[in-house]
Swiss-Prot record:
Region (Disordered): 47-79
GO cellular component: endoplasmic reticulum membrane
The protein, known as: Transmembrane protein 41 homolog
Major subcellular location class: membrane
Subcellular location: Membrane
Length: 334
């Protein structure tokens, strides 16, 4: 019996040891499982971190790309704006034509004038010596006296030659057209001379505009950078009433007409606005000059033409031309 009890105790002890071992194994298994789970979680966490880092990198790359694109677009826009500020619809501007074409155009124009003179009515040797472009008021009076003797019988050739020469002077910015304005009054009277001068002066200015745009715009930029900048700044403030501003500039002496002709195509002034503004703006001074030309033999000094009354009238017209701009600016402030 004692032996059996001992055996039983031994068996029980073995079982207990086995259970303890099993428990230890289970604990180890549990710990291993926990470690595995932790490892898996760590791996997942690392992957997430890596993914976040990749996402951040991608995001930064995208932001950098976007910034680069924005910078490129900004640079492109700035370039376009810079081009536009010194060019008519710069994005569509063709390359300027070679300057030697200007020499050809000038030569052709001279040839036309020479042809007209060759077909001019026969003049006496004394009169031929006096036919030249007037340089002062005395020359205008002398030329008016000579040509008036031929105008009635040779009206078409005289008026054609007058128009071509006036247009030529305006197109190539050559001084002397103001004296031809006086001459037109003596030769053609107010009814013909006034609209004729307005038309040929506008036509010549438009030719100057086109020559500057297609051939000479780089040369104009090079010769007058400061004046162009000032004119550009002035125009940018008057864009809403550009026509009125061109009229104002033509009436007033703030900018010479030849510079307005050359600079306007470089500063986004549309050609139709330029032509209409020029035609309207030169009317007051042209009217006074042509009217004075009718009585040119009685005028001793050009200053007699532009008396105080005439100056005040032109000042009033200049104010009227820019009045819409002033009103609009006042409304915006309010």
């Amino acid at each position: 019996m004692e032996i059996d009890n001992q055996n039983i105790n031994n068996i029980n002890n073995n079982n207990i040891h086995n259970n303890i071992n099993n428990n230890n194994i289970n604990k180890r298994n549990i710990e291993n499982n926990i470690n595995n789970i932790n490892n898996i979680n760590n791996n997942i966490s690392m992957k997430n971190k890596n993914n976040n880092i990749d996402n951040k990198k991608n995001s930064n790359n995208n932001n950098n790309n976007n910034n680069n694109n924005n910078n490129k677009n900004s640079i492109s826009n700035n370039n376009n704006n810079n081009n536009k500020s010194f060019g008519l619809y710069s994005l569509e501007q063709p390359a300027p034509l070679p300057l030697w074409l200007l020499v050809i155009v000038f030569g052709v124009s001279i040839s036309v004038i020479v042809f007209l003179f060759l077909n001019f009515p026969s003049l006496s040797p004394q009169h031929k010596q006096l036919i030249r472009l007037p340089k002062n008021f005395k020359d205008v009076k002398l030329l008016s006296d000579i040509l008036s003797q031929y105008t009635d019988d040779n009206y078409f050739i005289v008026i054609t030659t007058f128009g071509v020469i006036y247009t030529f002077l305006q197109a190539f910015s050559i001084p002397g057209s103001v004296f031809l304005s006086f001459l037109s009054g003596g030769l053609f009277g107010l009814k013909v001379g006034f609209p004729l001068v307005c038309f040929v002066a506008t036509l010549g200015a438009t030719f100057s505009y086109l020559i500057s745009y297609y051939i000479g715009r780089n040369l104009v930029r090079k010769l007058f950078p400061d004046k162009l900048k000032l004119f550009s700044d002035s125009l940018s403030q008057k864009r809403d009433n550009l026509l009125n501003y061109i009229v104002f500039l033509r009436i007033t002496p703030f900018l010479p007409n030849w510079f307005i002709n050359l600079a306007s195509p470089l500063l986004d002034v549309p050609i139709h606005t330029f032509a209409i503004g020029t035609f309207i703006g030169i009317m007051p001074a042209t009217f006074l000059a042509v009217k004075a030309g009718i009585q040119i033999q009685n005028i001793q000094n050009p200053s007699d033409i532009f008396d105080l009354k005439s100056i005040l009238t032109m000042a009033a017209l200049a104010l009227l031309s820019i009045l819409p701009t002033l009103i609009q600016k006042k409304l915006k402030v309010n």
